[in-house]
Amino acid sequence: MHAEVVSLANRFAEQLATLRGYSPNTVKSYLSDVLDLAGFLDGKLSEFKDLDLGLLREWLWQVSQREAANSTLARKSASIRSFTAWCHSEGLLEADPGQRLKSPKAKRHLPKVVAKDSLNEIFDHLKTLAETGEPVMVRNRFIFELLYATGIRVSEICGLDVLSIDLGRNVIRVIGKGSKERVVPFGLPARDALQEYLAVREKFLTEPGQSALLLNSKGKRLGVRAVYQLVAELLADTPTGAAGPHTLRHTAATHLLDGGADLRAVQELLGHASLGTTQIYTHVSVERLREGYKNAHPRA
């Protein structure tokens, strides 16, 4: 790899984490993309100050030859544009070659949505298991209920602390992308599941002072992978097919809009920086309406 670019990439990543407050996963993604460029530039660039648009385009073309999806190309080029903009602002580049680096637009697929009937079957199944009193089953029911009730991300539910919960107002304080905090409400089924979990949470504890809300069998904060596996297993037999926690997020948003929720309220609930990101769910709702019309109307 190009040693100078690697060094700058690490400095850039540190800035993203400390000054911009990006999450570890986001920083890791940016760093990976810049290191990809560093590998390409090795032997092609003597001094970093000579980096130009031609080299960036050549790198992006090489990435495309790996049969990368448009969404991957879009993400990688966005990472490099951020990197070169930072280098320019730091005086490391006289001009910003990444400013004119264009990438194919990521094709947007309509997100999967789990049918309400399928969800109700899962909720009933989880409630039956939780009624055994087994702490893991009680916890798992709460996880699924809260993910659907709030539409929060898997990283956000795993990051919750006990003090994140306000039972008096039925809300949770969530730390989202960019360390932005938002308040998200939840309904009575999730509240019931939460209270049942809080009653057995102490059985997971191995030491005092643990602040994490969701705990594993060792008394530590439950990891993202464990939640992903739980949700994936529960959704595996539904018509939706292979899916994970993000599908529950999509489903919650779509069901809210189906029920007449305001688009901006849903944007705030999900923690989207852009309204355009939330608008994808309006397309899902229209598609569902069209499909329902086609199946139900005698002259469809």
What residue ranges belong to the model's regions?
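Conserved catalytic core of the tyrosine transesterase superfamily
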Residues: 1-300
